[in-house]
C-alpha cells in the first residue's frame, strides 16, 4: 500500500494487476487501483478535481485531468473517508502513476493534496540485472 498525507488528509492506494483484462500478445496490461481518502482534519472538505500523470515503462507520459473521481465530488466531514476503485491500461508491462486532488474547504479555500506515486507491475515484467 502507498500512502501520502497533506493537511491532515490521508490518501492510500492499493494497485492490483488484472490478468483477465490484460494480454501480453496485444501489448495491453490493465491494473485496478483502490484509493481511500480520509479526512483527519477539523474542517469539512470536498474533492473537486483530479490530475494524474501516468508513465509507462518506456517513459511515455499521459496526463489526465477532470472533475471529481468516478463521477463524484465527495464531501468529507472530519473523521470521514471515501473509497473508490478505478483502472488504468498501459501498453507496457509496468509503469507508475502519481497525482493530486484539488480540494475546497468549508471556508472556500482551495488547496491541493498529494496522491502517492504508485507502481504498476505485472507478472510479465521481466527485469534483468547484469
Swiss-Prot record:
GO biological process terms on file: error-free translesion synthesis
Domain of life per record: Bacteria
Pfam family, one: DUF525
Phylogenetic classification of the source organism: Bacteria, Pseudomonadati, Pseudomonadota, Alphaproteobacteria, Hyphomicrobiales
Cystine connections: none
Gene3D superfamilies: ApaG domain
Provenance organism: Bradyrhizobium diazoefficiens (strain JCM 10833 / BCRC 13528 / IAM 13628 / NBRC 14792 / USDA 110)
Protein name per its UniProtKB record: Protein ApaG
Entry-linked PROSITE patterns: APAG (PS51087)
HAMAP family registered for this protein in UniProt: ApaG
InterPro entries: ApaG_domain (IPR007474), ApaG_sf (IPR036767), Uncharacterised_ApaG (IPR023065)
Residue span(s) of domain ApaG: 3-127
